[in-house]
């Protein structure tokens, strides 16, 4: 054939063909229908040795182009854009083309998975294999490069089982959802040796090259981010656009955890210890496994009260929280609680750990009593940072209205002390609620408090109540203890009749 001889004369061996960015592409539109893909675009040539082919037309011509040579064969090419396809006829080589249609094509890629870290470049290489080989291999086939994104949704799930004793995790595949596929590029070669491609919709995101000598195609995915997680399809089609081979190469976007922290909130003596392990900003979800240790020994979470959940932050990655509950005897010292985190992707593994020791608080003893016109609060065995706040009818009182003193050290708990605080009672002839509250514990504000009512009513006092009445009226009734008194009153507005005292027993 004429074309192979011409290309061999130009230096077939060692040539690299580069699919450049859309700056070298004239513009195109591609059908997204993957079941029946139809090419409809104005193709652009792929450069040879970095220089564009000058004789390649701007767009496929609707006219037939004939090329005569000194040989007895005529090579005719017909390009039809109205049918959205290329038709290649070679009258002198019908037998050769007939043989080519029976060739067995295949695509061999150097990997099935590409693990690439965030903001870096992922690469893979695929080789076209045709048995038996011929110079027209590329002319008979089309290569489509299709990207199928996979995204993760933020969900919550309790731990169901341990993969290893004490090792828990959330399977990321449970939360993986495919998105709409996207045709990245469609590559074909005409009988003159020129490679054509559709423009990439992502600018310089994808870089594709072809080596005609080794029949290999390389793909680079630059500046990888979370949206690049998914798999590439390399689809080989025949010149009738029928799919022959479909290879999948998974693009695994990777990000090691940015930080690991253990939070162990304070507890009261005798209450269970609780801890949370927070693994921040990793990818993908499901790549992190958490195990727990208590004083260096394996601690196993309980499925009925412990678990893990995660969420995804756009631009930052996934965050996982794992929890554990441990017993508290109330006698032993608080344990060292450790979280061991293993991040795994393929053959890569990264481990880290964090530790926390919870603070244990002891129950204080409070008592409230009234004496000599004061509400007196006695407190035993509190840490030095604890103070007292008084409330009257649940309203906080200024600290200038009461005083608190240290009365000594606690005999049963080291570095704890005893307090006494008092506030004057209100002599307002009613019942008044007084509350002595301890402030400074890392629990609910009303966790430690005592409340009592001070009864200042006359009946509670058990003494006569003297009422002085000044008035200009007359009154006519007799008072007896225990009676209900309905007394008629005669009011005189001009003069004062008398002053008197009513004594009610």
UniProtKB/Swiss-Prot annotation:
Keywords: Glycoprotein, Host cell membrane, Host membrane, Host-virus interaction, Immunoglobulin domain, Membrane, Secreted, Signal, Transmembrane, Transmembrane helix. Residues 51-85 are annotated as: Disordered. The keyword Signal applies. Residues 61-71 have a biased composition (Low complexity). InterPro entries: GA_GC (IPR001038), Ig-like_dom (IPR007110), Ig-like_dom_sf (IPR036179), Marek_A (IPR001654). Residues 492-505 are cytoplasmic. Its main location: secreted. One of its GO terms (cellular component) is membrane. It holds the Pfam family Marek_A. It is a single-pass membrane protein. Residues 257-355 form the Ig-like domain. Residues 1-27 form the signal peptide. It comes from the Viruses. The chain crosses the membrane at residues 465-491. It is found in: Secreted; Host cell membrane. May play an immunoevasive role in the pathogenesis of Marek's disease. It is a candidate for causing the early-stage immunosuppression that occurs after MDHV infection. Belongs to the herpesviridae glycoprotein C family. This is Envelope glycoprotein C homolog.
């Amino acid at each position: 054939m004429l074309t192979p001889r011409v290309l061999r004369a130009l230096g077939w061996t060692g040539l690299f063909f580069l699919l450049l960015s859309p700056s070298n592409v004239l513009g195109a539109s591609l059908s997204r229908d993957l079941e029946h893909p139809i090419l409809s675009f104005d193709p652009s040539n792929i450069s040879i040795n970095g220089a564009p082919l000058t004789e390649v037309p701007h767009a496929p011509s609707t006219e037939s182009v004939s090329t005569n040579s000194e040989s007895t064969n005529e090579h005719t090419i017909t390009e039809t854009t109205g049918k959205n396809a290329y038709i290649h006829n070679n009258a002198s080589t019908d037998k050769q083309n007939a043989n080519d249609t029976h060739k067995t094509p295949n695509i061999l890629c150097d990997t099935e998975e590409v693990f690439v870290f965030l903001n870096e470049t992922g690469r893979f290489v695929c080789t076209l294999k045709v048995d038996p080989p011929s110079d027209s291999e590329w002319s008979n086939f089309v290569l489509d490069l299709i990207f199928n994104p996979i995204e993760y949704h933020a969900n919550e799930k309790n731990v169901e089982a341990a993969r290893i004793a004490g090792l828990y995790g959330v399977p990321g595949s449970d939360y993986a959802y495919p998105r709409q596929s996207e045709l990245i590029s469609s590559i074909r070669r005409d009988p003159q040796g020129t490679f054509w491609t559709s423009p990439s919709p992502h600018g310089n995101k994808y870089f594709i090259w072809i080596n005609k000598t080794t029949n290999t195609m390389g793909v680079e995915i630059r500046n990888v981010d979370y949206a690049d997680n998914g798999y590439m399809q390399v689809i080989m089609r025949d010149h009738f656009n029928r799919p022959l081979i479909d290879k999948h190469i998974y693009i695994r976007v990777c990000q090691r955890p940015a930080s690991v922290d253990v939070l162990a909130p304070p507890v009261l003596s005798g209450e269970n210890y609780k801890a949370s392990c927070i693994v921040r900003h990793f990818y993908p979800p499901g790549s992190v496994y958490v195990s727990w240790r208590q004083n260096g020994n394996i601690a196993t979470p309980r499925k009925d009260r412990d678990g893990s959940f995660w969420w995804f932050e756009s631009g930052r990655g996934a965050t996982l929280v794992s929890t554990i509950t441990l017993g508290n005897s109330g006698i032993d010292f608080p344990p060292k609680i450790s979280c061991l985190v293993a991040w795994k992707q393929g053959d890569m593994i990264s481990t880290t750990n964090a530790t926390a020791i919870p603070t244990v608080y002891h129950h204080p003893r409070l008592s409230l009593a009234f004496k000599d016109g004061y509400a007196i609060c006695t407190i035993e065995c509190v840490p030095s940072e604890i103070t007292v706040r008084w409330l009257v009818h649940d309203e906080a009182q200024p600290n200038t209205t009461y005083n608190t003193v240290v009365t000594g050290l606690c005999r049963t708990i080291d570095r704890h002390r005893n307090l006494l605080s008092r506030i004057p009672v209100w002599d307002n002839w009613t019942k008044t609620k007084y509350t002595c509250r301890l402030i400074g514990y890392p629990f609910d504000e009303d966790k430690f408090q005592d409340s009592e009512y001070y009864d200042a009513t006359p009946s509670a006092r058990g003494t006569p109540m003297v009422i002085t009445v000044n008035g200009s009226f007359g009154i006519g009734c007799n008072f007896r203890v225990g009676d209900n008194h309905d007394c008629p009153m005669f009011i005189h507005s001009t003069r004062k009749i008398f002053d008197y005292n009513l004594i009610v027993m």
